[in-house]
Swiss-Prot record:
An individual GO BP term: translation
HAMAP family (UniProt xref): Ribosomal_uL5_B (MF_01333_B)
GO cellular component: ribonucleoprotein complex; ribosome
Protein name as it appears in the record: Large ribosomal subunit protein uL5
Molecular functions per Gene Ontology: rRNA binding; structural constituent of ribosome; tRNA binding
Species name: Tolumonas auensis (strain DSM 9187 / NBRC 110442 / TA 4)
Upper classification of the organism: Bacteria, Pseudomonadati, Pseudomonadota, Gammaproteobacteria, Aeromonadales
Described function: This is one of the proteins that bind and probably mediate the attachment of the 5S RNA into the large ribosomal subunit, where it forms part of the central protuberance. In the 70S ribosome it contacts protein S13 of the 30S subunit (bridge B1b), connecting the 2 subunits; this bridge is implicated in subunit movement. Contacts the P site tRNA; the 5S rRNA and some of its associated proteins might help stabilize positioning of ribosome-bound tRNAs.
């Protein structure tokens, strides 16, 4: 079991109950899922690019990514409806906790000139989104085998009702917010 999951059960729940005055343990916000998304615009010209991106995402997440297709045609971008343009992975349960632990403890400190993540990236309902410019910050990616440095989007979906609750939940996991 992931260390962060134990921390959540033993200390974070109690802290948040005291801080927000919840009556029940079930009212305490929890992390529902983590979604990793990689948009690959170059996939239109070369299909291999999408395969490499999917391979990177599979290595980072530990599960096979879903290839996302264009929802509608856009002439300006030269894409048609149904074209494969990216890949995504939704992590839940044990894999989610393990990924979050690796993200906070290993990957974020490896970001160049890292001073913390913005505390303003909440969506109004307690969910947090962030972008990573380089996939090579993850230890699962071998720098020598990377064909191109790509970024990815990470969305942490919580059951929090407000941004304040979501921020408190992530801060309890020592999420590195910028001061």
């Amino acid at each position: 079991m992931a260390k962060l999951h134990d921390t959540y059960r033993q200390t974070v729940v109690q802290e948040l109950m005291n801080q927000f005055g919840y009556n029940s343990v079930m009212q305490v916000p929890r992390i529902e899922k983590i979604t990793l998304n990689m948009g690959v615009g170059e996939a239109l010209a070369d299909k291999k690019v999408l395969e490499n991106a999917a391979g990177d995402l599979a290595a980072i997440s530990g599960q096979k990514p879903l290839i996302t297709k264009a929802r509608k045609s856009v002439a300006g971008f030269k894409i048609r409806e149904g074209y494969p343009i990216g890949c995504k992975v939704t992590l839940r349960g044990e894999r989610m906790w393990e990924f979050l632990e690796r993200l906070i403890c290993i990957s974020m400190p490896r970001i160049r000139d890292f001073r913390g993540v913005s505390a303003k990236s909440f969506d109004g309902r307690g969910n947090y989104s962030m972008g990573v410019r380089e996939q090579i910050i993850f230890p699962e990616i071998d720098y020598d085998k990377v064909d191109k440095v790509r970024g990815l989007d990470i969305t942490i979906t919580t059951t929090a009702k407000t941004d304040e609750e979501g921020r408190a939940l992530l801060a309890a996991f020592s999420f590195p917010f910028r001061k």
